[in-house]
Amino acid sequence: MFAYFRGRLTSAMPDEAVVDVSGIGYRFLVSAFTYRQLPPPGEDVLLYAHLSVKEDAFLLYGFSSESERQLFRLLLLTTGVGPKLALAVLSGLQVHEVHEAIMANAPERLYGISGVGKKTAARIILELRDRILKMSPDGGKTIASGSGGNLALQIKDDALNALITLGFSKPAAQKAVTGILEGNPSLSVEEVVKSALVSIHNS
């Protein structure tokens, strides 16, 4: 419903921010990461928005980047993960760190986050990796076909599809994947994706 809000930051705390947009104050629930990106009160700010509708309330969640909002929505697809826990994950790790944990099948990286136990971490890894494959542009067919074709090309396509599904633009994903494979063509799909996430984040 809402893409983003641009206005004047009137107040901020580690878990929420109030933005004045044309005389109307909007309260956003935010992650610790977004809180650290906020300007001082009184300055202009842009927050990417997600609206959560409950029986008794409409809650706005605000994010400092589109990639953080995309990951928040992806986390909500996990069984047992609601907005509060998804926000906790984003407060505990940066976006690229969560991506890396998912693609590297490393649930132990999520254990230290408040509210995330071993079972929840394992579900996040399992369910999001599966959804990434299913949501890829080719429906996961390239990844599913383990035989035939050029292995290097298959690895490149698999990594590219995974990055696009995670919300990165195709040009950015192609640039990162191509550069990484040129330097080390023997990497696995997971290693390429992990390196690409770091490359895109630092670019």
Curated annotation (Swiss-Prot):
Keywords: Cytoplasm, DNA damage, DNA recombination, DNA repair, DNA-binding
Positions of the UniProt region annotated as Flexible linker: 144-150
Ranges for region Domain II: 65-143
Cited SUPFAM superfamilies: DNA helicase RuvA subunit, C-terminal domain, Nucleic acid-binding proteins, RuvA domain 2-like
InterPro entries per the UniProt record, alphabetical: DNA_helicase_Holl-junc_RuvA_I, Hlx-hairpin-Hlx_DNA-bd_motif, NA-bd_OB-fold, RuvA, RuvA_2-like, RuvA_C, RuvA_C_sf
Subunit and partners: Homotetramer. Forms an RuvA(8)-RuvB(12)-Holliday junction (HJ) complex. HJ DNA is sandwiched between 2 RuvA tetramers; dsDNA enters through RuvA and exits via RuvB. An RuvB hexamer assembles on each DNA strand where it exits the tetramer. Each RuvB hexamer is contacted by two RuvA subunits (via domain III) on 2 adjacent RuvB subunits; this complex drives branch migration. In the full resolvosome a probable DNA-RuvA(4)-RuvB(12)-RuvC(2) complex forms which resolves the HJ.
Domain statement: Has three domains with a flexible linker between the domains II and III and assumes an 'L' shape. Domain III is highly mobile and contacts RuvB.
Designated name of the protein: Holliday junction branch migration complex subunit RuvA
Provenance organism: Chlorobium limicola (strain DSM 245 / NBRC 103803 / 6330)
